[in-house]
Amino acid sequence: MTNAPVTNARTDRFFNFPVTILIFASFMLGMSEFVVVGILPDIASGLKISEVTVGNLVALFAFVYAPCTPIGSALSARFPRFATYLILMGVFLVGNVLCALAPNYPVLLIARLLIASVSGTLVAISMTFAPDVTTDKYRTKFIAWVFSGFSIASVVGVPIGTWVANTFGWRVTFYLVSVLTTVLMISMALVLPRNSHPAKIGFLRQFRLFFDRRIQLGVLDVVCGAAASYVFYTYLSPIMRDEIGVPEQYLSIGLVIYGCACLWSNLYGGKLADKGRGVEPLTHIRPIYCVQAVCLCLLAFASLVPAAGALLLVALGMLMYLQNSASQVLYMDVAYQSHPGSVNLAASLNSMSFNIGIAIGSAVGGLVNDLLGLAWLGPVGAIFALFAAGITTLLRPYIQR
């Protein structure tokens, strides 16, 4: 394989151009994934279908995202990284253009599933650029900022996309995503490193990574942590409206405030992940899970003191993603140390695990809401948080002294 002129883009500055491009890539992936929630009524009206039918796009997106992420990442390890990354970005671009042009729901569904099939793999490949675009001291900061691209998409991208849809039509939102993606791809072609080391082991052998006890516990921890949050987060708007008493016209402001708390959570999670290597950073999250469990239990009483309930939601937003960088460090360090041919696959595990947790948390939350009501969502989520805390304890014997 021939190296292009750009082979290593590391500098002493963290926010160099390649790093900024990769953060912007995660922002675009997040905006494309989440914007459907904001423009759901517009799509339903435009295609003359029910909002429930459009809402199914969100669940089906996650359903395809979770299995395609590890499979796509393992396959991508067999090919030159730079070319694979640009090709998958091209698929992402085609999916968004197809969304904008979709004449009916089946075509829109196919387009969304096409986007879902490559999004997780793109995140995983982004993570593998870390050694080439930044120095080791910024490694966890890089991971945190790549994840934060999704939070920024929730806080900034989705409101912009919603405003564009309300003003010019929902198709223009997808055209906007497509134009920005085109600019992003041109920038990637100019500045991203082109050196890579394709895996020399077979496709199936990469999945031996899953037999590593540290990986198993790490995946289970992220699943439980995500489920703990999404039991209540799925019903965040109804909780704000019915339990805390936020007026309907101020719900969007409340969601932006919550999104800012989540952004802080991702960024501070990067600082927590700096405390050690391998499994160690994730073991430090145990007390955070315990605090999260307490906050979730207290959420049951939010309607009694609405102001305190609002502060509680902000606190839960600040706790929501603190494990992200620590778990990514675990996956990557274990892979580099014990499974060097499975690095791409390891880089995909956080996205895969979190989406499984989202699916479980959302399903459990729906069941609890139907049977017991909104007030019980927090206490049930606390059970998952305590499970996550227990799993971090099981990881302690694997800390390398």
Model-derived features: positions:
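A late C-terminal transmembrane helix in Major Facilitator Superfamily
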Residues: V334-L372
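Helix-to-loop junctions at the C-terminal end of transmembrane segments
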Residues: T69-P80, N266-V279, N369
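Conserved MFS/SLC helix-loop-helix module at the cytosolic interface between two early adjacent transmembrane helices
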Residues: P67-P106
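Paired small-residue
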Residues: V91, G95-L98, P106-I115, A307-A315
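Helix-breaking motifs and short loop linkers at transmembrane-helix boundaries and internal kinks
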Residues: K48, P80, L101-V107, V118, ...
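Primarily marks hydrophobic transmembrane alpha-helices of the MFS/SLC 12-helix fold
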Residues: Y85, L108, L282-I285
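Cytoplasmic helix-loop-helix junction between adjacent transmembrane helices
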Residues: A111-G149
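Helix-loop-helix hairpin linking two adjacent transmembrane segments in secondary transporters
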Residues: Y105-V107, T135-P193, Y235-D242, P247
